[in-house]
Amino acid sequence: MSKYQKICTNVKISEIHFKNGTIDIYFKDSDEYNLLIACADCCSESWFELFVDDPIDQIIGKKIQSVQYVKDIDLPPSGVQECDINHVYRINFTDDTHYDFILRNSSNGYYDGWLEIHKKKILKKLII
């Protein structure tokens, strides 16, 4: 069982918003969305990066089955701090495809980053 229980599953993805530290995944006919956050320990910095030939908007229309950690990889130094750790995460879909992305963390070598997933409600706009 995935440790990321807050992920919305079996609902079509309708929209994606990607920023360095967050990925917002919105779902068709739903008042909920998932917020994926690149978290960091006290003296480090974390952010998401995508693989060059793998645009994230290709997951629109798919249904998420699970999210999992895959492996650590070597990448060119980020130059943010002294040491980098690069975690590959995978979103698995119900059609047996997947999408990989990178959570990068840079620190003095004593700290690391991690992925958090939050389930959020879409705030309705009031029309007055």
Located regions from the model:
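Surface-exposed, interaction-prone regions used to assemble/regulate multi-protein complexes
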Residues: 1-128
